[in-house]
Curated annotation (Swiss-Prot):
Residues 11-193 form the tr-type G domain. SUPFAM superfamilies: EF-G C-terminal domain-like, P-loop containing nucleoside triphosphate hydrolases. Keywords: Cell membrane, GTP-binding, Hydrolase, Membrane, Nucleotide-binding, Protein biosynthesis. Its main location: membrane. InterPro entries: EF-4 (IPR006297), EFG_III/V (IPR035647), EFG_V-like (IPR000640), EFTu-like_2 (IPR004161), LepA_C_sf (IPR038363), LepA_CTD (IPR013842), LepA_IV (IPR035654), P-loop_NTPase (IPR027417). This is Elongation factor 4. The gene is lepA. One of its GO terms (molecular function) is translation elongation factor activity.
Amino acid sequence: MNQEEMLDRQKHIRNFSIIAHIDHGKSTLADRILELTDTIAKRDMQAQVLDDMALERERGITIKLNAVELHYKAKNGETYIFHLIDTPGHVDFSYEVSRSLAACEGALLVVDATQGVEAQTLANVYLAIDDDLEIIPVINKVDLPSAQPDVVKEEIEEMIGLDASDAILASGKTGLGVPEILERIVTDVPAPSGDLNAPLQALIFDSVYDDYRGVVLDVRVKEGQVKVGDTIQLMSNGKQFQVTEVGVMSPKAVKRDFLMVGDVGYITAAIKTIQDTRVGDTVTLADRPAEKPLKGYRKITPMVYSGLFPVDNAKFNDLREALEKLQLNDAALEFEPETSQALGFGFRCGFLGLLHMDVVQERLERDYDLDLIMTAPSVDYEIIMTDGTEKTIDNPADMPEVSEIKEIREPYVKASIMVPNDYVGPVMELSQRKRGEFVTMDYLDKYRVNVIYNLPLSEIIYDFFDDLKSSTKGYASLDYEITGYRQSDLVKMDILLNGDPVDALSTIVHKDFAYERGKAIVARLKTTIPRQQFEIPIQAAIGNKVIARSTVKAYRKNVLAKCYGGDITRKRKLLEKQKAGKKRMKSVGSVEVPQEAFMSILKMNDEESQGK
């Protein structure tokens, strides 16, 4: 392809993303776009084509961003190259959205005609506005009887400030409005800027590990071009590799001779060491490097921490390898080795939220065939020591002695809860119960309210989302952002089994709720810890003070079965012998803590844990 043809190709490239709140139908709309551009043969078509992870299909949600190249012949007779990047809608995966948008010039804002603008719609739109993208509003699901497109148009204008007079009315199910969407992408989304002859600058927005090809880099080329045989250099560490293959996803991998300005594709270069690459790095050519790297991504900070341990300790290295490979594909995951007396060697992992944690555990167990135990989640706590020093901990087991602590601070979030008017009461009640502090309440229209609360993050990560959905019949939507740390009256609660503290079961709780939480944990453990030959006392303690206790009764063999009548002293002797044996067994016996015990604490029910 000569210079002129390349410049003409650049003019015909359109890069766009689809952003929406969870369940507003963006993956279905993406299916219709793939169908209409003949990217996928009718016989290969299936629901949510771009959600190619088994886990995504099962849960019906998008977890990973996905890039795909389409070819569309517009009404003006010219063929355009579209790069569509499908994004997740859940608050835990907003980092995936921000990375997708950095690779685009435009975005389709999809809003459900029956639900209207929701919390995550707003959060994602602001990301797109920050990146200065051209936004095309699409009102989806207009074929439903309960659709209110005019009301939704008003909401888009009032809440987001976008002109929605020419918003496209569409249905991902029937395909209505999809041809109009494609035409608007051609006319409204600008072609990528960038100099074809400048030194190569390509932004790594995702990566994945392939057993045969090594690390596969997903890139958006911002300047210059790259082809097979070129020697590339990673600008963060100066490492050099020879390109073995370049191509695009359509939606399966299609090899190409080169990638140029505006292209969204992949590069393989026999990169075998996972640590050499990171998302947000810039790829350039070794013999003609760019002067400075592209603006990468802000460092993402995990919000929730949990211990991850292999059931079989011999699998520790397998778990490390699996986490390293997964981290390539999930840039928000953080981990470091840790040791637990109860569970052996494992890793302390940082996640963006509870769904992210759940998804990581499931991907590790499925894709890497590991059996794992996950401890109850915790957040970062700032501890001011009596000598004036500061310490940050994310593991209750690391909590210093009470005598050394001056104050403990915990992270707070500003939670924005959008809810129909009828459910404001239950939402406020739930937020107050979770130690929330009311900030303000805005009436969005006649039907819906945006309630804003300051809440401790530790209260949100357990079951706040589940409780919110059940108390509002599924109508509420939630978005939150960290606002800082505040001093709180927190204590460390230890769980003792057979008199020994189990470090993996320790939790940090608010003093006011310690008794109820301790009582509930002890009751839950009693039902999940299997009975032994000796009885097991389960205790919840703060310092040396036991605040709750229960006992798992022992199995007993009937030692009197062979005694038919006879002297009572004979029976007493047998019973005393059994008692002595049980006592000896108890002093040396160790208690196995099953995975269900950890999970039962993870999903503590609100009525138990905070004594409604």
